[in-house]
From Swiss-Prot:
Name listed for the protein in its UniProt record: Threonine--tRNA ligase
Recorded catalytic activity of this chain's protein: tRNA(Thr) + L-threonine + ATP = L-threonyl-tRNA(Thr) + AMP + diphosphate + H(+)
Family, per entry: Belongs to the class-II aminoacyl-tRNA synthetase family.
Ranges where the TGS domain occurs: 1-61
InterPro entries xref list: aa-tRNA-synt_IIb (IPR002314), aa-tRNA-synth_II (IPR006195), aa-tRNA-synth_II/BPL/LPL (IPR045864), Anticodon-bd (IPR004154), Anticodon-bd_dom_sf (IPR036621), Beta-grasp_dom_sf (IPR012675), TGS (IPR004095), TGS-like (IPR012676)
Xref: NCBIfam families: thrS
Record's function text: Catalyzes the attachment of threonine to tRNA(Thr) in a two-step reaction: L-threonine is first activated by ATP to form Thr-AMP and then transferred to the acceptor end of tRNA(Thr). Also edits incorrectly charged L-seryl-tRNA(Thr).
One Pfam family of this chain: HGTP_anticodon
GO BP: any one term: threonyl-tRNA aminoacylation
Positions of the UniProt region annotated as Catalytic: 242-533
Main location: cytoplasm
Cofactor(s) needed for function: Zn(2+)
Cross-referenced HAMAP family: Thr_tRNA_synth
Length: 640
């Protein structure tokens, strides 16, 4: 006679084993109809699963985060059902849940087309309309092998082979289609109505480019049509803001097949890049950082000492010269330790903050490359702080403040922070971990900042803080990192002379604010839709004459603004002024200065914004002062 305790503390007793669905029905028919699954003693189970002993139970509905994830997972299975009906020779691989949706990897003799994607979606809708029950059967291993052998599902058999300890597995039946999964899944297809297939892409079996290529069908699913419509609207807005399209339209950069994952910066884009670099250089100098430059190609021996060769070799570009193995650096930290090691340091010299705009290269899979957001060649705003254990908290607090100030200058105020603590496998004593975790937590607390605790998610060599910023579409981008490291200074023999004259290893704080210039610029492009604040805009003002008679004065204005440190240019083409205004508005230039005969006579400029606001005529010096104020605000105001 199980007694079921519900979240409100109420209890229900039954004289026999009872399913989650039956408990829901005993509460009410409406709840029973909305039941997706259950959480029994904290563990997610299917609605059909029996509860035989006393237990706590939470009924999971589409309104719960877990319910939405289950809906998405079941939609992936529905993709399998539709694909097997339309393309019987296709072989199904895996179909997991991802952020905002799901995908299914499929092996098929030809590439799927957009027409195929539409056909699969239509068949899924037809299957949903049949309103059939999804049947779960816990099946012995040998029978699972028989089922997938009879269906020629080679990849499912390989997955079973990779789970030698599993003697029974969950099979979920969508009518004639069967898939293997730990579950749980929806009890009926009526929960899957609010979905949409979104795109196709390539993938590799087990994510390894050496393996056979597969096709990936992506989709999204939501609890109701309203949520789906809102998501589709966000996606359409994101597509409008795609940094690749805007980058091409504004002449910022391009990529091409001959240099996959590498960026060709154009004059406008390189100007933007340099503005970021000069800003970060100034900020770091003001906060006690010393800028250095280290080699890009380094002998294998250093990477072996640091541990990167053993753990990261597949992601490193390597070469040989004179019988020696080299790697192009994927990160800067081992080289920064070499700078620290030149000359024995005293505790009086700590903390030592070494910064580098370090060019790094990583051999990312070609399928993962994405514009300038995911590249093989990139530059980090990288720095390493070498300090004593007693200095960890103060250095962490200073970095947190610096990072939030930088994000605010770029217009990002909504920042999420995560503190990741010790994993099971780690180096260093528990006492050292206690101090390190306490230092990071205290630094966050002293700043009055809320944060999510991620137990066990730290690196084996130290805890870390992650900084994620939220853009105008509500998307979250993880950019900044503060990582404490007890291990690398020991591996690379970094030492300092302590106050008692003994030699000790410093604590090393790996830190970055932007992450990489390339990715951060991509985020900025999408956040601002290319309409950068005046301080970032590659061209801050364009001066346009109405006729040739005003050309000389236009050039004078350009020179005056340039001498004041502004990025201004003249457009003296023999085009109608309306045409010029439209063109530079589309190029997102913040300020458009029009000069006609009256402006020449009065020695003024007629000022318009890219948004179409008419600011009137003003002397050049007054506009320069106005522009200087706009630049000084940086991104801390949305409108200027």
């Amino acid at each position: 006679m199980p007694t079921i305790t519900l979240p409100d503390g109420s209890q229900r007793s039954f004289d026999h084993a009872v399913s989650v669905a039956d408990v829901a029905l005993s509460i009410g028919a409406g709840l029973a109809k909305a039941t997706v699954a259950g959480k029994v003693d904290g563990k997610l189970v299917d609605a059909c699963d029996l509860i035989e002993n006393d237990a706590s139970l939470q009924i999971i509905t589409p309104k719960d985060a877990e319910g939405l994830e289950i809906i998405r997972h079941s939609c992936a299975h529905l993709v399998g059902h539709a694909v097997k009906q339309l393309y019987p020779t296709a072989k199904m691989v895996i179909g997991p849940v991802i952020d905002d949706g799901f995908y299914y990897d499929i092996a098929y003799e030809r590439p799927f087309t957009p027409d195929d994607l539409a056909a699969i979606e239509q068949r899924m809708q037809q299957l949903i309309e049949k309103d059939y029950d999804v049947i779960k059967k816990v099946t012995p291993r040998a029978e699972v092998i028989e089922v997938f052998t009879a269906r020629h599902e080679d990849y499912k058999l390989r997955l079973v082979e990779g789970m030698p300890d599993e003697q029974a597995m969950g099979l979920y039946y969508h009518e004639e289609y069967v898939d293997m999964c730990r579950g749980p899944h929806v009890p009926n297809t009526r929960f899957l109505k609010s979905f949409k297939l979104t795109k196709l892409s390539g993938a590799y079996w087990r994510g390894d480019a050496k393996n056979e290529q597969l096709q990936r069908v992506y989709g999204t699913a939501w609890a109701d049509k309203k949520q789906l419509a809102a998501y589709i609207q966000r996606i359409e807005e994101a597509e409008k803001r795609d940094h690749r399209k805007i980058g091409k339209r504004l002449g910022l950069f391009h990529t091409q097949e001959e240099a996959p994952g590498m960026v060709f910066w154009h004059p406008q884009g390189w100007t933007l890049y340099q503005v970021l670099e000069q800003y970060m250089r100034k900020v770091q100098r003001e906060n006690g950082y010393l800028e250095i430059k280290t080699p890009q190609v380094v002998d294998r021996s250093l990477w072996e000492k640091s541990g990167h060769w053993a753990n990261y070799a597949d992601n490193m570009f390597t070469t040989q010269s004179e019988s020696r193995d080299y790697a192009i650096k994927p990160m800067n930290c081992p080289c920064h330790v070499q700078v620290f090691n030149q000359g024995l340091k005293s505790y009086r010299e700590l903390p030592l903050r070494l910064a580098e705009f370090g060019a790094c290269h990583r051999n990312e899979p070609s399928g993962a490359l994405h514009g300038i957001m995911r590249v093989r060649g990139f530059t980090q705003d990288d720095a390493h702080i070498f300090c004593t254990e007693d200095q960890m908290q103060a250095e962490s607090a200073a970095f947190i403040k610096l990072t939030l100030d930088v994000y605010a200058d770029f217009g990002f105020k909504d920042i999420e922070l995560k503190l990741s603590t010790r994993p099971e496998k780690r180096v260093g004593s528990d006492e050292l971990w206690d101090r390190a975790e306490s230092a990071l937590a205290s630094a966050l607390d002293s700043a009055g900042l809320p944060y999510d605790l991620q137990p066990g998610e730290g690196a084996f060599y130290g805890p870390k803080i992650e900084f994620s910023l939220k853009d105008c579409l509500g998307r979250v981008w993880q950019c900044g990192t503060l990582q404490l490291d007890f291990n690398l200074p020991i591996r690379l023999s970094a030492e300092y002379v302590s106050e008692d004259n003994s030699r000790k290893n410093p604590v090393m704080l790996h830190r970055a604010i932007l992450g990489s210039f390339e990715r951060f610029i991509g985020i900025l492009i999408e956040h601002y839709e290319g309409a950068f604040p005046a301080w970032l805009a590659p061209t801050q003002a364009v001066i346009m004459n109405i006729t040739d008679k005003q050309a000389d004065f236009a050039l004078e204005v350009e020179k005056t603004l340039a001498e004041s440190g502004f990025r201004a240019k003249s457009d003296l083409r023999n085009e109608k002024i309306g045409f010029k205004i439209r063109e530079h508005t589309l190029l997102k230039v913040p300020y458009l200065l029009v000069i006609g005969d009256r402006e020449v006579e009065m020695q003024t400029v007629a000022v318009r914004t890219r948004e179409g606001a008419d600011l009137g005529s003003m002397p050049v010096a007054q506009f320069a002062e106005f522009l200087a104020q706009a630049v000084s605000r940086r991104g801390r105001q949305d409108t200027e």
